[in-house]
């Protein structure tokens, strides 16, 4: 497990501890720092900043290290933020002993993102959550509320 200068921890959560938490408790732990974020969050510099049942927000500030060869921010940053926010929104609906994984997701990039864009937030909201499948939608916005990208996901729900 590693720790950032901001006090956030990164790593993998022990299976027994994870099974003992509801989905909402799990995501709340990511937000408040009592549970570690994944290593992708460390690599890309994003954080999970808000949670309510069926609703999650992840945020990042794009920087030069996120650029593609053309100079704009690589679409993978938007994809990762949306995948995280939407998937965790589904996770927040689950009972203890259950987890989810992304089966598929689709995003549409609407505006270029650059290092000058500033803070961006991906908001994921559950559309439907059944026993085996959950769906969610998401949007990525800048600080002025402009939609930079949007997407949908389908998640497989399984006993963990």
Predicted regions: what is each one?
Residues 1-160:
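Terminal targeting signals and extreme-terminal segments of soluble enzymes
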């Amino acid at each position: 497990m590693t720790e950032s200068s901001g006090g956030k921890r990164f790593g993998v959560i022990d299976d027994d501890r994870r099974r003992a938490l509801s989905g909402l408790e799990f995501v709340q732990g990511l937000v408040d720092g009592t549970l570690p974020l994944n290593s992708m969050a460390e690599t890309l510099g994003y954080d999970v900043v808000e949670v309510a049942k069926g609703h999650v927000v992840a945020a990042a500030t794009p920087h030069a290290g996120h650029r593609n060869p053309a100079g704009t921010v690589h679409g993978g940053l938007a994809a990762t933020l949306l995948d995280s926010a939407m998937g965790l929104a589904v996770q927040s609906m689950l009972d203890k002993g259950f987890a989810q994984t992304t089966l598929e997701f689709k995003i549409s990039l609407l505006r270029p993102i650059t290092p000058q864009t500033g803070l961006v937030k991906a908001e994921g909201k559950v559309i439907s959550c059944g026993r085996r499948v959950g769906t969610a939608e998401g949007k990525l916005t800048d600080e002025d509320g402009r939609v930079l990208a949007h997407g949908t996901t389908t998640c497989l729900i399984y006993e963990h």
